[in-house]
């Protein structure tokens, strides 16, 4: 099983929990994230490596579209402690540029509005690999800004520790200072 499939499997727990909640509460939805797409000729595998805006928009599109009585919203499920920078920026663009409602469902099984999301201030030093990792804006770890040798060593050390990293730029979510909402707030969509 490749690393992407391992991550998808981990997120499946939260996704299954969410789908069960939606079904129990008769909330209309459909799975809109690209990992749910049916494809031919390995399209979903190929798109992961494309860097154009359209491909990245598709790759980072939120997992669920919730359809209420008077409005719809998008929800991304994240069963991890962090979020990739490109992913976050795509959601932020949907909110700021298109006035689209985007929520995150995080590993604590709570909802968060993008504008309420807070990030932890991070140190450059990564204890797992015992290396300094470039950091921007005090929150974004940027492993791909290392030179090629350091980056490969970084990935190798993570793997040796039985850990996974995509190597993408990411930030850790500050679960103490982020404002969360109970899943039951979605029930108001049907009123």
How would you describe each model-predicted region?
Residues 81-89:
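Active-site-adjacent loop/helix micro-motif of nuclease/hydrolase catalytic cores
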Residues 34-35, 78-80:
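Histidine- and/or cysteine-centered catalytic micro-motif in compact active-site loops
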Residues 62-79:
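Conserved catalytic cores of phosphodiester-cleaving nucleases, focusing on short active-site segments
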Residues 29-30, 100-102:
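Hydrophobic anchor at the start of a short beta-strand
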Residues 106:
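Conserved phosphate-donor
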Residues 51-62:
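Glycine-rich, highly charged phosphate/nucleotide-binding loops
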Residues 2, 24, 36-37, 52, ...:
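Non-catalytic C-terminal interaction segments of nucleic acid-processing enzymes
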Residues 1-53:
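Acidic-basic catalytic patches of nuclease active cores, encompassing PD-(D/E)XK
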